[in-house]
């Protein structure tokens, strides 16, 4: 179902799908020819909408990375046919769904392998998996430095009905300026792969480079890279050199719900943390931390009204916050920009990061009361309303 902007009188986020495509092409232009690309779309594509994002970038991808089997199933039900890899752990009770929906799990224990092999025999069909290695992230995977790590890998390769289609690991600190730990992970990964080869294993698809690795040129000598946060237009760390130009895909809008005049000495919001020093014109924005707007931005951040920065007054409430519009023209129902560009001004997640907002966390926490409205090169093409489960059956053009 495609809905116009008028359907959202309170707030909505805009996702420019062409920016996702541009980011992939920009990243690929810095990689060697033939490098395969995995788009990481876990956590509802970092809050952007998993099905809509996957549809927009599928032609550029060899693989989609998700965190849970439920996310993989959502993609399959959304018509995605590209291979899917679960980067996390699949509960044993959901193993059979891997066959039903043609989804690959991460494999790293004998118990997993034996159980999956037994199901493969019953199903009469092998299951493709990726071998997960822990080279220093400390999360999941075969601990490559432990005694027996290679033997475990060989055993998993030998299980009937199990096809090891890939081997991967994950950088933990590649966005740090000091690359000592990353270099150690690179050595461990390369050493494990070399040992497998020496023991007679023909290596499948190998990948270790994440967004930070891609942007820093680390781990890009292998067969594939996995792009997460950079796909959506952000660098993993504000301290990284901006070698690759990226476009932020998501912006956030709201409409003023109320405007009032207040005298000097008037308190605003909970705790009276802001008290006016003079007469002011104050507008209410009907968005709060219940929608994912960070409370830590109270009395700090600004929004754009007519392209003009207007500061937040007092604490951000669950559903509303107030701004100073004394110096700008503003009216009820006027659209304001909470995040993104308006005219020559921009509110960015890097600005918020200065006040303790972690960009990844914000995107993942953008609430389900905030509809996502999709554009393709500036044209409105679809809407996803999490509360109403309104997934677009197909993108439809609508003049903006």
Where are these regions (language model features)?
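Active-site anion/phosphate-binding pocket segments in diverse small-molecule metabolic enzymes
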Residues: 2-21, 44, 71, 90, ...
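Active-site-proximal beta-alpha core segment in soluble small-molecule metabolic enzymes
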Residues: 2-7, 11-15, 19-22, 32-207
């Amino acid at each position: 179902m495609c809905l116009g902007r008028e359907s959202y009188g309170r707030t909505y986020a805009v996702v420019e799908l062409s920016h996702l495509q541009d980011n992939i092409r920009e990243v690929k232009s810095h990689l060697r020819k033939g490098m395969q690309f995995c788009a990481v779309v876990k956590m509802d594509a970092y809050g952007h909408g998993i099905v809509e994002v996957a549809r927009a970038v599928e032609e550029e991808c060899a693989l989609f990375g998700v965190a849970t089997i439920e996310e993989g199933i959502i993609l399959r039900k959304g018509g995605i046919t590209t291979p899917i890899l679960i980067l996390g752990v699949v509960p044993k009770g959901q193993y059979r769904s891997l066959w039903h929906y043609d989804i690959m799990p991460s494999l790293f224990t004998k118990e997993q392998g034996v159980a999956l092999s037994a199901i493969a025999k019953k199903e009469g069909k092998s299951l493709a998996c990726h071998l997960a290695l822990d080279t220093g992230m400390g999360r999941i995977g075969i601990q490559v430095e432990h005694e027996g790590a290679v033997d475990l890998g060989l055993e998993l390769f030998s299980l009937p009905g199990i096809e090891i289609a890939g081997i991967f690991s994950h950088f933990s600190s590649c966005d740090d300026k000091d690359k000592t730990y990353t270099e150690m992970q690179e050595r461990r990964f390369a050493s494990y792969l070399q040992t497998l080869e020496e023991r007679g294993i023909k290596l499948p698809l190998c990948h270790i480079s994440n967004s930070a690795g891609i942007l820093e040129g680390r781990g890009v000598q292998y067969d594939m890279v996995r792009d997460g946060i950079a796909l959506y237009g952000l660098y993993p760390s504000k301290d990284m050199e901006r070698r690759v130009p990226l476009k932020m895909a998501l912006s956030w809008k709201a409409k003023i719900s109320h405007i009032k005049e207040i005298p000097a000495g008037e308190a605003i919001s909970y705790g009276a943390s802001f008290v006016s020093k003079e007469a002011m014109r104050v507008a209410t924005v009907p968005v709060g931390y219940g929608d994912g707007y960070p409370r830590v931005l109270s009395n700090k951040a600004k929004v754009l009204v007519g392209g003009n920065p207007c500061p937040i007054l007092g604490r951000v409430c669950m559903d509303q916050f107030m701004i100073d519009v004394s110096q700008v023209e503003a009216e009820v129902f006027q659209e304001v920009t909470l995040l993104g560009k308006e005219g020559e001004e921009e509110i960015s997640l890097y600005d918020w990061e200065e006040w303790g907002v972690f960009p990844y966390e914000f995107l993942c926490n953008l609430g389900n009361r905030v509809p996502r409205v999709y554009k393709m090169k500036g044209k409105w093409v679809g809407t996803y309303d999490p509360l109403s489960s309104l997934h677009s059956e197909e993108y439809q053009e609508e003049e903006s």
